Amino acid sequence: MAKFTQHTGLVVPLDAANVDTDAIIPKQFLQKVTRTGFGKHLFNDWRFLDDAGQQPNPEFVLNKPRYKGASILLARENFGCGSSREHAPWALTDYGFRVVIAPSFADIFYGNSLNNQLLPVKLSEQDVETLFQLVAANEGIEFEVDLENQTVKAGGKSYPFDIDSFRRHCMINGLDSIGLTLQHEADISRYEAQQPAFLN
């Protein structure tokens, strides 16, 4: 997986709490098990006025020209709630998002995001509200998210965030479960070499 140390990007505000995984990627689009191709269906029922996804909803925030190319999503509490589907972070990353900032996340979504190099950043409700106001008042504003130093820099201020040290290590080094295992390849080989022949 790609390493994540620091990211600077345009921010789009999704001013809604309790955004569930069915809103992020509706169930009718979950027929694939590969990670690509889901971005075009991200927030499908909100982005489009028709079932075929041909008529963009001009009122939905992702369709507004000022947020085109955004790579940081600013959201409200309990983002990613609902059913467990790894397709949700797949859709967000395939669309182009690298970071989601919110006061809280559903636990399963939070873990799935970290496993797929999408950084979920938890900030206080007060800090998130400040950031919403900042984005509304400054068209084209970018945030700098520094995973190594665990800070979000925006509007001349720095907002610290917490993340599990193991998860942080994996993201910074681009390690998934296979990559973590391969870090111990030499130890595994030595162990296997010590096994009795009848076990091989």
Curated annotation (Swiss-Prot):
Record keywords: Amino-acid biosynthesis, Branched-chain amino acid biosynthesis, Leucine biosynthesis, Lyase
GO molecular function, one term: 3-isopropylmalate dehydratase activity
Cited SUPFAM superfamilies: LeuD/IlvD-like
Gene Ontology biological process: L-leucine biosynthetic process
Pathway(s) served: Amino-acid biosynthesis; L-leucine biosynthesis; L-leucine from 3-methyl-2-oxobutanoate: step 2/4
Keyword field contains Transcription: no
E.C. numbers: 4.2.1.33
Enzyme class: lyase
GO cellular component: 3-isopropylmalate dehydratase complex
Pfam family, one: Aconitase_C
InterPro entries: 3-IsopropMal_deHydase_ssu (IPR004431), Aconitase/3IPM_dehydase_swvl (IPR015928), AconitaseA/IPMdHydase_ssu_swvl (IPR000573), IPMI_Swivel (IPR033940), LeuD (IPR050075)
Known function: Catalyzes the isomerization between 2-isopropylmalate and 3-isopropylmalate, via the formation of 2-isopropylmaleate.
Protein family: Belongs to the LeuD family. LeuD type 1 subfamily.
Record protein name field: 3-isopropylmalate dehydratase small subunit
Organism: Serratia proteamaculans (strain 568)
